[in-house]
């Protein structure tokens, strides 16, 4: 039942996860090749290329590594926000 509700919510959502164009932009901004990024992810250039084209869903562990590599939030990569970095405030 819960899975059905989640699917329905995602189908009705205006947010579309369009991470693949951002992956390429971030990589190019970092002056890196697909092969270099793939090596950091311990995967092949072919697999990474599929992430950038949207032909393959990126695993969470790769998403986290890329966010750290590029200094952006995972939400930015996923297209859920246009703010690259999450502001962290210290509380006392």
Residue ranges and their predicted role:
Residues 1-15, 78-92:
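Short, charged recognition helix plus adjacent turn
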Residues 19, 23, 73-74:
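Hydrophobic side chains within well-formed alpha-helices
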Residues 21-40, 65, 90:
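Short basic helix-loop element that most often maps to the first helix and adjoining turn
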Residues 23, 37-38, 48-51, 77:
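Conserved hydrophobic/aromatic packing and binding residues within compact polymer-binding modules
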Residues 41-57:
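Recognition helix of helix-turn-helix/homeodomain-like DNA-binding domains
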Residues 42, 61-76:
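DNA major-groove recognition helix of helix-turn-helix/homeodomain DNA-binding modules
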Residues 52, 70, 81:
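DNA major-groove recognition helix of helix-turn-helix
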